[in-house]
Structure formats: structure tokens, C-alpha cells
């Protein structure tokens, strides 16, 4: 989440008046994330999230995202749900951009990922995959293997600003991924951006542990290889700050997932390749954002080199056992 578009008090009041959510008390920008403009909206009836859709979000795909959140919530997955206005619409326009208000999900994301967090993540991700099985809409993953080379070409001229030989490294890896990408693995609804800041936890004080309270930010959700979601999480959840891979975290996440949705031998064997692809996807998008984020935007740029180093790790993985598979 981020803030690219400032909303005036008058514009906000007029927009909120379309909903039965009470009187606006405050509206505070949320700086985390990189895709859309987000505000924490407080009214005299409660808290909400106001989102203005920017950049890579195609307005024609917004009914997919909003409908998906409603579908998953109806199937028992904890996630925000769109608030419908008095006219029944969940999507309207604010400051010239598509905009929506969604419910506020209690909890916080953890800045320090523990073994317990990974153990909670696995079964919840599998539950989401199963819940999405009968969602009637589909959406292609525009940031999967077919989209990586065009994205690379858009950063190639300036890639050396990040690392002198980055362009050649990416080109070599893309050649490999395009030649070997799996085409026959189980496909379904995936989140595709299940980073720690999109997973909320609440403290269970009695048990002395954190319990997952839900998933947020479904605006990259799509129809793709289910195990690719797992590969994204191997990258996002299982590396330590010093860059070391934590196989115990990976094992707990994978074991929890497999208890809810067993993985086939083909899916397990494909994990190293899928993890390389996931690292490439975020290396490319982070590189693009690093080079193209507007000056003065209220957004935190994320270091693309983190994913270059993760890619290098996965290139050295020879089998799923190195991810803690038992």
C-alpha cells in the first residue's frame, strides 16, 4: 500500500456520503506497499480502508478482485470485504481514479517472522486455494513467465544503475525460465503477493503466541499454478535478514500447507524452479519501481538486490529437500 494521490477533505466527504458508514472522523495515508493509494478511514461507526487504484491495476479487472474478496470471506477465509454504497455499488470514482472502501481487518503484520508465523501461514494459504476453487471468474497472471521479458526490456537501459551486470544476469535467467517453466501443474486461484505485510496476526495472550487474523491486498490475485504461491512465500517468509535461508521456517510452512492440501510429487519437484521464477518476478518489479517511482511519492522503495540474492540461492538448489521437505 502507498499514497500517490492526495484526497481533499471536501472530496472525501462527498465520497463517504455515498455509503452508510457514518461521519468521517479522520483519514490517514498508509505508506507501506507500492501499488495503490490507501488511507485508513475512521468514521463514527468504525474503521475502513479507502483505496484509489493506480499504476498496474487495470480498472476492468477490479470486479474480479472485489468479487474474489467477497467469495473468499463467504467461504470462511478472513479477509477484507468491499463496502457497498447506498446504490449497491462497491466501485466508484474518486479524484479521477477508481476507488473502493473495504472493511478493516484487525491485526498487524509482523516485522519479525517467527517459526510460529510460518506454521500459521501454510494451512491458511492452502485453505485459500481450496476456497477459490469454485470462484467463477478467472484472471491471467500478467506478471508470470510470459510477462517477465517485456518488463525486463523496460528496465534494461537503466539496469546498470542497480548492478553493473544485472541486465546480462537477468537475460540468462529468463532464457532458462522460459525454456523450463512447468505447464502441467495444478492451477487455481492464487494470491500472488502473499508477503508478510499482507498477512495479519493478533496476539493470543493466553497461549503466548500470534494467531493469523487474515490476508489483505488481493490486487495481484490471479489464476495460475497453485504451487507458485508457495514459491512466493518461500522467498518472502523463509530468508533471514542476513540473507540466509531458514529451512525450518520452510518446512513448517510446507508441512502446514500439505496437511490441508497435499502436494503432488510433480509440484514438490517443481518448487526450486518456481522459486527462481518468483524471485525473478520480484527482482523485475522492484527494479522497475526503483527506477521509476515518482519523486516525492509517499512510498517506500524496496531494494531489488534482495531478490537478486534470493535468485542466486535458488539457482543452487538441486531438489525440494533443501526447502525442508520431509
UniProtKB/Swiss-Prot annotation:
Coiled coil: none annotated. It comes from the Bacteria. SUPFAM superfamilies: Protein kinase-like (PK-like) (SSF56112). Keywords: Amino-acid biosynthesis, ATP-binding, Kinase, Nucleotide-binding, Threonine biosynthesis, Transferase. Transmembrane segments: none annotated. Gene3D superfamilies: 3.90.1200.10, Phosphorylase Kinase, domain 1. The keyword Nucleotide-binding applies. Pfam families: APH. It catalyses: L-homoserine + ATP = O-phospho-L-homoserine + ADP + H(+). This is Homoserine kinase. It comes from Paramagnetospirillum magneticum (strain ATCC 700264 / AMB-1) (Magnetospirillum magneticum).
Amino acid at each position: 500500500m502507498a499514497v500517490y494521490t492526495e484526497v481533499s477533505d471536501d472530496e472525501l466527504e462527498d465520497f463517504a456520503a455515498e455509503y452508510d458508514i457514518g461521519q468521517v472522523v479522520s483519514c490517514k495515508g498508509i505508506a507501506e506497499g507500492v501499488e495503490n493509494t490507501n488511507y485508513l478511514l475512521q468514521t463514527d461507526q468504525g474503521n475502513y480502508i479507502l483505496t484509489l487504484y493506480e499504476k498496474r491495476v487495470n480498472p476492468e479487472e477490479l470486479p474480479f478482485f472485489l468479487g474474489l474478496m467477497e467469495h473468499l470471506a463467504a467461504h470462511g477465509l478472513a479477509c477484507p470485504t468491499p463496502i457497498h454504497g447506498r446504490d449497491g455499488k462497491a466501485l466508484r470514482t474518486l479524484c479521477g481514479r477508481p476507488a473502493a472502501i473495504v472493511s478493516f481487518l484487525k491485526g498487524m503484520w509482523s516485522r519479525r517472522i517467527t517459526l510460529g508465523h510460518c506454521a500459521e501461514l501454510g494451512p491458511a494459504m492452502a485453505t485459500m486455494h481450496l476456497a477459490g476453487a469454485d470462484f467463477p471468474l478467472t484472471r491471467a497472471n500478467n506478471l508470470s513467465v510470459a510477462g517477465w521479458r517485456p518488463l525486463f526490456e523496460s528496465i534494461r537501459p537503466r539496469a546498470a544503475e542497480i548492478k553493473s551486470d544485472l541486465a546480462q544476469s537477468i537475460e540468462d535467467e529468463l532464457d532458462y525460465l522460459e525454456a523450463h517453466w512447468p505447464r502441467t501443474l495444478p492451477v487455481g486461484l492464487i494470491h500472488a503477493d502473499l508477503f508478510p505485510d499482507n498477512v495479519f496476526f493478533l496476539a493470543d495472550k493466553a497461549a503466548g503466541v500470534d494467531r493469523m487474523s487474515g490476508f489483505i491486498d488481493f490486487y495481484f490475485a490471479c489464476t495460475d499454478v497453485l504451487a507458485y504461491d508457495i514459491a512466493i512465500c518461500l522467498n518472502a517468509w523463509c530468508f533471514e535478514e542476513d540473507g540466509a535461508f531458514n529451512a525450518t521456517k520452510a518446512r513448517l510452512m510446507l508441512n502446514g500447507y500439505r496437511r490441508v492440501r497435499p502436494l503432488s510429487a510433480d509440484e514438490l519437484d517443481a518448487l526450486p524452479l518456481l522459486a527462481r521464477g518468483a524471485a525473478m518476478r520480484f527482482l523485475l518489479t522492484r527494479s522497475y519501481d526503483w527506477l521509476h517511482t515518482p519523486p516525492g511519492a509517499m512510498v517506500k522503495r524496496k531494494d531489488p538486490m534482495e531478490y537478486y540474492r534470493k535468485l542466486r540461492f535458488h539457482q543452487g538448489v538441486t531438489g525440494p529437500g533443501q526447502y525442508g521437505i520431509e
